[in-house]
Each structure stands twice: as structure tokens, then as C-alpha cells.
Amino acid sequence: MNQTAILICCLVFLTLSGIQGIPLSRTVRCTCISISNQPVNPRSLEKLEIIPPSQFCPHVEIIATMKKKGEKRCLNPESKAIKNLLKAVSKERSKRSP
């Protein structure tokens, strides 16, 4: 290979390695805008997501997806009812796993 081809390959490589750290979305923020303190029946849950704090959102976020209509609710992780829900769900999961 001649020097020009090697130089072009090096420049392309350096450019692509710099792109790796750029976020895809400019709207990086917390997922939950408002949170609910209301208790949720574990049987009505389809999915429960716990999102830890990150550089984009300093809060723990708990997102419950309901079986009916697939509605998503953000739950207050500090609420006693939600803490009890998390215990019940983890207890149920531990029964299912061998």
C-alpha cells in the first residue's frame, strides 16, 4: 500500500473511534415525569422495570407495565406500598426460579 492509502485508513479509523461516545439522542433525561404513590396489585403487572440512577437521571425509576392495555406507570420508590410490592415480586420470582 502506498502512504496515502495508509493515511486515509488511519484518518477513517480515528474518526470512527471518536464517534463512539456521542449520544444518539439529544433529549437525555429521566424517563418518569410524574410518579404514583398508589399501591399496585402484583397480579395486574405484566412487567416491572427498575432503572438505577445514572449520569442522565439522579433518581431510581420504577416503571410498571400493566397487563390490561399495556399502560405504563412510574412508581415512587420511596413509597411504603411500592417497597412492599417490590418485596412481593422478588419473593414470587424466587419461588419460580430453581
Swiss-Prot record:
Compartmental location: Secreted
Record-linked SMART domains: SCY (SM00199)
GO molecular function: chemokine activity; CXCR chemokine receptor binding; CXCR3 chemokine receptor binding
Signal peptide extent: 1-21
Gene Ontology CC annotation, any one: extracellular space
Lineage: superkingdom: Eukaryota
InterPro entries: Chemokine_b/g/d, Chemokine_CXC, Chemokine_CXC_CS, Chemokine_IL8-like_dom, CXC_Chemokine_domain, Interleukin_8-like_sf
Keywords, comma-separated and alphabetical: Chemotaxis, Citrullination, Cytokine, Disulfide bond, Inflammatory response, Secreted, Signal
CDD domains in UniProt: Chemokine_CXC
Primary site of residence: secreted
Protein's GO biological process: adenylate cyclase-activating G protein-coupled receptor signaling pathway; cellular response to lipopolysaccharide; chemokine-mediated signaling pathway; chemotaxis; G protein-coupled receptor signaling pathway; immune response; inflammatory response; neutrophil chemotaxis
Record-linked SUPFAM superfamilies: Interleukin 8-like chemokines (SSF54117)
Functional note: Chemotactic for monocytes and T-lymphocytes. Binds to CXCR3.
Annotated family: Belongs to the intercrine alpha (chemokine CxC) family.
Name used for this protein in its record: C-X-C motif chemokine 10
Species this chain originates from: Macaca mulatta (Rhesus macaque)
Gene transcribed to yield this protein: CXCL10
